[in-house]
């Protein structure tokens, strides 16, 4: 599912769209099914330590004005898949696997976009912290071509992951 927004603002003024969608997904699933999912980084949603959904946010800017004119947010969510290929079976999952879904795709989509539009920005980091898969765990990341390892200690007020590195 995708949504096309036209914010027409400077980059610094953009709402944290990816975080907004991630929070909306985990809250919608919890509300409609009682199933607890988690946020890894900010663009991946996990269920039972396996990836269930991914979020991709792309922005288009105007060279003349320097403003972000368009934002497209795409969400891939495994809704009801019972069998994954062998190479994905240990790392991917679906909201519903062998059981019959208790909700429809349309119900879930509707709830996600409703929450996307209504979760207060001030609550986004709180949801991310509550649903984080990585806080207090060892993580590895790359920055400027160098690989770092450390422990994810905190999520900043703009959704950034703060890591205490080994060096």
Regions found by a protein language model. Name each.
Residues 1-6, 16-19:
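Primarily the active-site beta-strand->alpha-helix module of PP2C/PPM metal-dependent phosphatases
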